[in-house]
Every structure is written in C-alpha cells, then in structure tokens.
Amino acid sequence: MKTELNLFDRQLTLFRYPNNANETLQAWDAGDEYLINYVEELALDTPQNILILNDHFGALSCWFSAQHQVTMMSDSFISQQGAKENLQRNQCREVKLLTTLDAIPTETSLVLFQLPKNNRHLTWQLTQLRKTLSPDVPVVAVNKAKEIHTSTLKLFEKYLGTTKTSLAWKKHRLVFCQADCAQMNDISPVTRWNVEEHKMTLNNLPNVYSGESLDLGARFMLEHIPQDDNLKHIIDLGCGNGVLSVKAAQLNPKAKFTLVDESYMAIESARLNLQENVTASVDAEYIANNCLDGFAGEIADLILCNPPFHQQQAITDHIAWQMFCDAKRVLKRGGKLQVIGNRHLGYDGKLKRLYGDKNVKLVASNSKFVILQATK
C-alpha cells in the first residue's frame, strides 16, 4: 500500500481509517491528485477560504491547509477521523470539520468537491451550495470519468448553475460550476415512505443507504427480529435509517437501544424514525462511530447487524469482520449477534471462525439472503 503522496516537491503521509495492518487500499485517489494539480496551477496569490466536500480521508484538507483556511464537510465519521489523524500526522494547520447536515460557511471563496455516491446526497449538497454561494465562487468537483454521466451534469445545471467539464486524466474528470441558476424553493432533505405490513413510516435523509425504498435484506430481516423479555440492551450496528430498531422496539418496548452508524445522516434518520414509529417512550442512544470502537465489553444481549461492504468508493469486507469481532467483545455471555447478508458473502464461515461452529445457526434464508445468529 502506498502511503506517501508526492506532488510539487511536497510529501504527505496518508493512511485510511481505521489504519489496518493488512490494508491494501490507499488513502487518496487520482481525483484528489487532479484537484490538487488544478488548484496549484492556478497559482492563487492570496489565501482562500476553501470548502472541501466529501474528502475521503483528508488528503485534500491536509494539502490545502498549508496555505489556506480549510473547512471540511462530510457525512462520514470515518472520513472525519481519518482526516483528523492525517492532519496530525503531517503537522497541518487546523481544519474546521462539519457534517453535511451543517450550514455551508458563508465566507467560502472556493469549493472543492469529491462527488458522493448517490444522487440524493449530491442534489442536497448542490441545493445547499446554491443557497449560500455567490456566482463568483468557483466550484470544482471530481469523480471517475465513468461515474460522471449526462444526468450528473444536468443535476449541477438544475440545482447550482453553469457547468462544464475537463478532459479526463487518470480516468478522472473535473466538473466546473458556478452558482448562477435561478433560486429554487427549499427542498426538504427528508424522503418519507411507508412500510405498510410493519406499520411504519420511515424518514430518510439524503445519504442514507436505500433511502428511497426498503432494501430487500432489511425487509427479510424484519420478519425475524427476536422478541424476548430477557433482552435488556439491544445494539443496532450499522443502523442506517433505524428500521431494524423500530421493529425491535415495537417487539421489545422495555429494552434499551443503542444505534450506531458511521453516517451522521443515518443516525439522525434513525432518531426521527424511532421517535415517530414507537408509541412508547423508547430508551435509545444514537452514536456516530466506527463500529463499536470504545464500547465497554459484555454489555449487550442482542446485536442486530446488516453489514455494509463499501467504505467510501471501495468494496471491502473488513467492515463486516470488524463488526463481528466488536460484537463478540461487546455481547454478554450468552448474548446473540443476528446478521443478514447476501449468500455469496460467506458470513457463516467468518462467524464460525469467531464464535465456533456449534454457536452459529441459520435463522432463515431465501434465494438471495441468509440470516445467521451467533451466540457468545
């Protein structure tokens, strides 16, 4: 794994977060390099107030903090922690960290923008930029060229303003935009829809996974949520919009709940959904975190888990493995981890390695998914 970014006779040492010993993915990509090259070639003669959106692990924030005032906005707890560590590692100047739920800083003079994965999140960020920026503030975005579609550029033109693109470089392309389109009425960040068969109405902020409909895995898992008066503390690990906790709280109203996700928008969506869909006052805590880092051991009776297999733009299985390891530490003796995953992901083998063959059982399966339960 390459950890040294060398450009313009400068060097940064950059790691992903968490910094795993067997990590093979680097902490920046060619898109970061393209943005750095572009801005450096502008030879800006005065310090700028640079707003950086969706900086993966702080490469852009580290680079530009040397000469400019930098604000980094991200929906990712993991990205923010990675940026903090890389800023400290490289003895960089202080960078202001915000979530994408926060307001766009009014003093911004340049916006640099790693495009998010989903168009709902992109649309939200563009509308927030349009509300705040004047037309003379340049917005420069980057992504892999194959991910910048005509529909992507139409979103820029509709919600922000005049848009053009660069030539491709190392399979990446820049998008240049200025905030000059007609101001639109405020767009609600929340998408709402019903799950009739489970008597729920779910609120979804723009960057929540499967925010426009209930994903098939969660729908299957809802049919198999345990109901047991002995469940005192239930953790929803990788909670997303909190749909599993809503069902679990409806079935186990006396339990304490802890909902954990690395997305700030997921955490806020989960909070809204428990408040709206659980009639009794639920004892719940909502935590943006990297898995169960910092949690005490042997505190949970049940952990529900629908693991992601993406970190930023990369496909990886280390998140599921960390979740399973953390769950084993945090579960009480006799506590259970209940996991859903696609059949091809092989979670049964991972769980048996951790919990032992005889302690892992199949709860349910269909043509696409398996639900597994591991007992500590």
From Swiss-Prot:
EC number in record: 2.1.1.174
- Give GO cellular component annotations, separated by semicolons: cytoplasm
Location in the cell reads: Cytoplasm
Kindly give the InterPro entries that the UniProt entry links to this protein. Answer: DNA_methylase_N6_adenine_CS, rRNA_m2G-MeTrfase_RlmG, RsmC/RlmG, SAM-dependent_MTases_sf, Small_mtfrase_dom
Which catalysed reactions does the entry list for this protein?
guanosine(1835) in 23S rRNA + S-adenosyl-L-methionine = N(2)-methylguanosine(1835) in 23S rRNA + S-adenosyl-L-homocysteine + H(+)
What is the top-level taxon of the source organism? Answer: Bacteria
Q: What is its main location?
A: cytoplasm
Enzyme class, broadest EC rank: transferase
A Pfam family assignment: MTS
Provide this UniProt record's keywords sorted from A to Z. Answer: Cytoplasm, Methyltransferase, rRNA processing, S-adenosyl-L-methionine, Transferase
GO molecular function annotations of the record: 23S rRNA (guanine(1835)-N(2))-methyltransferase activity; nucleic acid binding
Q: What does this protein do?
A: Specifically methylates the guanine in position 1835 (m2G1835) of 23S rRNA.
The record's HAMAP family line, in alphabetical order, gives: 23SrRNA_methyltr_G
What's the family? Belongs to the methyltransferase superfamily. RlmG family.
Q: What is this protein called?
A: Ribosomal RNA large subunit methyltransferase G
Q: Which species is the source of this protein? A: Vibrio vulnificus (strain YJ016)
